[in-house]
Amino acid sequence: MVSKLDKYWQHPALYWPLLILFAAATPFTFAPYYHFWLMPLIFGAFVRLIELRPRFAVSSAYLFGLTAYTTQFYWIHTALHDVSGLPDLYAVPLTFLLPAYLALYPALCFWLWKKFTLPRGIKIGLVLPILWTLTEFARERFLTGFGWGAIGYSQITPDSPLAGFAPFGGIHMVTLATAFLGVWLVLASDNTARSGKRLLPIILIAALLAAGYTARQTDFTRPDGSRSTVALLQGNIDQTLKWREDQVIPTIQKYYEQVGKTTADIVILPETAIPVMRQNLPENILAKFAEQAQNNGSALAVGISQYTSDGNGYENAVINLTGYQENNQDGIPYYAKNHLVPFGEYKPLPFLTTPLYKMMNMPLSDFRKGGGKQSALLMKNQKIAFNICYEDGFGDELIAAAKDATLLANASNMAWYGKSNAMYQHLQQSQARAMELGRYMVRATNTGATAIISPKGNIIAQAQPDTETVLEGHIKGYVGETPYMKTGSSWWLMGILTLAALILFIFRNKEH
């Protein structure tokens, strides 16, 4: 049955504008706004709209995804046009290219959903959240993967009980819980259904929120007794100036002075803080940085690009200058970025993209992977598992290093995206990783968001974005494993995929 409100929503003059409006509101559920309560309402309204016009389910889902991802990732245009100087003739269509691809996943979800002939309560209340989560997982994994904008990230805030599921099953379990909450709200608010049918989703909503709240109070990792002070350097180097030859010395001087101003145990510089290949630097530069830190009793990590050991490529690295020896350049401990950004750090289609790179004047666009098995870097009394840039958007890939680490660290340069929401969305992903892995996460960035995050995902300290500053604070080393660290996302997702297949098998057999 259809309520009076639904009759209005069904009308094409309202249906399509409402669909676009709901999708365009999704950015407000994520950082920096953190209106977490809005996402289940948006998701529920979106599902209800599709229920009203099921014939347009796939096209509606695609339009919703296209609108949501375009409004969330508008900062692609900032990187292409404002920073790289690409004319709007190229920048505008290229900005839509990623959202147009990502929108295929919501469309796939509802294409699969239409294949199920099931009672409404099961089809909406059980199967749809499962399919949505599975397609979100596929979006994070297929090709190079891009998990930004998963609805679970909207719940990574101190106020949402659903964030409590992160240490159990990662961000995808939070996504599943968010989708469940959205569709159960639809079923619970259906005033055309019998009161008995509305009672069950109300009970499920209460149970879900209670379970999330309880999970949030549970600790799986523990302090190992070590305490450290950290200093996270934010140079605020304009991206349009960063790689200019006449800016190299001023940039190095700026970071050298910042290192000299802190006596923290651990000092971390951002991604590619020194805009010169390590092997091309005069050897005394790194020696001076190491000496400056040593004089202040600090261990120092520096973001810098370097040639690979075979000399045939280059890596995006963080080098550990603790115990640096000028005559042993090849013995410097380092972490090299492994999950590279397609079209940004390597060229998947060089015959098509090389002319574009020349127009954009992009430096260092063909990095090599650092490899999946890299050890934590020992700095003072902490073993630090580093990741660089958007690597902390892939939780499963951080598990192996985190098991042997007491602290997580991200080095980034978000200056590509100006003063947009990109830095805050990235910060929220780091909050999720801290919760999933049960450890402090520290972030050293060029322009923001430089921050210290607790194992509960709370932002303890944050530097003012777009300023030259040093953020100092205290952290504790943590050990132990969360349930998520033991299984990752794949195993329990395979379980719910099996459940979905079992539901389809049972009900099809009943029909026959």
Swiss-Prot record:
Main location: membrane
Protein name (Swiss-Prot/TrEMBL): Apolipoprotein N-acyltransferase
CDD domains: ALP_N-acyl_transferase (cd07571)
Annotated InterPro entries: Apolipo_AcylTrfase, C-N_Hydrolase, C-N_Hydrolase_sf, LNT_N
EC numbers: 2.3.1.269
Pathway annotation: Protein modification; lipoprotein biosynthesis (N-acyl transfer)
Family: Belongs to the CN hydrolase family. Apolipoprotein N-acyltransferase subfamily.
General function of this protein: Catalyzes the phospholipid dependent N-acylation of the N-terminal cysteine of apolipoprotein, the last step in lipoprotein maturation.
PANTHER family given in the database record: APOLIPOPROTEIN N-ACYLTRANSFERASE
GO molecular function terms noted in the UniProt entry: N-acyltransferase activity
Membrane topology note: Multi-pass membrane protein
Enzyme class per UniProt: transferase
Residues of the CN hydrolase domain: 233-477
Listed transmembrane segments: 5-25, 56-76, 92-112, 118-138, 168-188, 195-215, 487-507
Gene that encodes it: lnt
Entry's localization field: Cell inner membrane
Keywords: Acyltransferase, Cell inner membrane, Cell membrane, Membrane, Transferase, Transmembrane, Transmembrane helix
